Amino acid sequence: MLKIPEVTLLILADLDLPDAVYAINKSCEEIEWGAAKFLGSKRPEGLCDQVEYEETYPIQSIDDFNFYCIYNLTNHVRTSHCLLIHPDGYVIRPQLWDNKFLDYDYIGAPWRDDPNAYLDPWGRNQRVGNGGFSLRSKRLLEVPSKVTVPWEVNEGTFYKHQNAGLYNEDGNICVHNRHIFEAQGCVYAPVSVASKFSREDTLPDSEEETFGFHYHFQDIR
């Protein structure tokens, strides 16, 4: 069995519980993680032996989910990195894990190369990356506890949020407020690495086979 002791596997879910249980159990089938945790306000049935349950306040909306991911995930992680998965995004090819992924503070499936989308405050298209299956360092998780990371990124003239998701936590961390995380030393994976790590959409530079996925059109199961 593959051992990845540096990484805590996380899923945060109060809805879609059967799919969330499937996703985290599937991600544990051939990997022994540093820790594996199901986060939510109610303990689900059917978790495999490797998965611990840790209670959160109720996650009643997508905004609750996004806020928790930005400001509270750090409380659940004691390893150098965590892998955040979703009910519709999980490990599918454990053999494609690469320890070089740990060189980065954030990796997620690339977004499209579009001059009118995923624009940071300086109008630059940021392509990495999707949060639905994403590797994050403890350093990145701790940034909001050290400096101010604005939540209201859909207000004012500083932010350019074309197609970057308003309150979506991955848009906040990787687009709107990326400069804040980079100023704290966080390094985002290049597209060439992110394309090997995960896939969300079919893009010209997509890899056919990846370590994980999020919301792929293909029925992975």
Residue spans for each PLM region:
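Short, conserved loop/helix-junction motifs that constitute active-site signature segments
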Residues: E30-I31, H76-R78, D98-L102, R136
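Short beta-strand-to-loop acidic/aromatic patch adjacent to the donor-nucleotide binding site
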Residues: T79-V91
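Conserved donor-nucleotide/metal-binding helix-loop-beta segment in metal-dependent transferases, i.e.
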Residues: G89-W122
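Catalytic core and acceptor-binding pocket of nucleotide-sugar-dependent glycosyltransferases
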Residues: V128-R221
